[in-house]
């Protein structure tokens, strides 16, 4: 089901619900403490499952090779979002299959609870919005390059939400992924790199 609903733009604080968050280095700063979930720059913790030396900045080439970024709801002291990088959809899928097994005892996919991810035209869940429950969807022209924030489905309903910069016929391009066990109850705002840039969405 793919529908658009009207919603008044409301200035609102971002409230973070208590969700499962993986253990992260002590040097990180909670996004909840910052009270800001604007997705901008990334600090890659792993790439294709391999640890990245935190003392060494990734080369520009390595950064360009990353096709999908899984954003974690934690930032380092510089304000960069901690993230897992993947150089292909195949490497991402391999991670997801293992991660689902790890999470299955915590969040059983039952289809209960909030079923869908909501996508909004403005930051902080403002303006019109659409919602999507499952699978891949090329956005219609009315929503192409229009998404500015999102609120994920429950982790008991599905695993993740991905924004793709291109449609499937255009090769997908880069993607930014939000794991529902991390982001449920939070509002992710897109900064310049992803604000009004998505041409397709995917719920797994």
Where are these regions (language model features)?
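Compact beta-sheet-dominated domain cores in extracellular/mature segments
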Residues: 31-204
């Amino acid at each position: 089901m793919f529908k658009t609903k009207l919603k008044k733009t409301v200035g609102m604080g971002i409230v973070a619900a208590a969700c499962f968050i993986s253990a992260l280095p002590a040097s990180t700063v909670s996004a909840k403490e910052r009270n800001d979930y604007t997705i901008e720059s990334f600090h890659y913790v792993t790439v294709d499952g391999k640890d990245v030396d935190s003392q060494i900045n990734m080369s520009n080439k390595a950064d360009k090779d990353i096709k999908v970024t899984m954003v974690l709801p934690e930032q380092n002291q510089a304000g960069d979002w901690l993230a897992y990088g993947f150089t292909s959809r195949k490497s991402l899928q391999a991670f997801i299959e293992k991660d689902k097994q790890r999470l299955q005892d915590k969040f059983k996919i039952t289809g209960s609870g909030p079923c869908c991810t909501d996508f909004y035209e403005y930051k902080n869940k403002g303006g019109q919005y659409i919602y999507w429950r499952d699978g891949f969807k090329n956005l219609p022209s009315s929503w192409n390059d229009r998404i500015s924030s999102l609120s994920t489905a429950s982790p008991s309903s599905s695993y993740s939400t991905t924004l793709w910069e291109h449609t499937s016929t255009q090769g997908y391009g880069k993607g930014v992924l939000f794991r529902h066990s991390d982001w449920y109850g939070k509002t992710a705002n897109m900064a310049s790199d992803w604000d009004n840039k998505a041409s397709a969405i995917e719920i797994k």
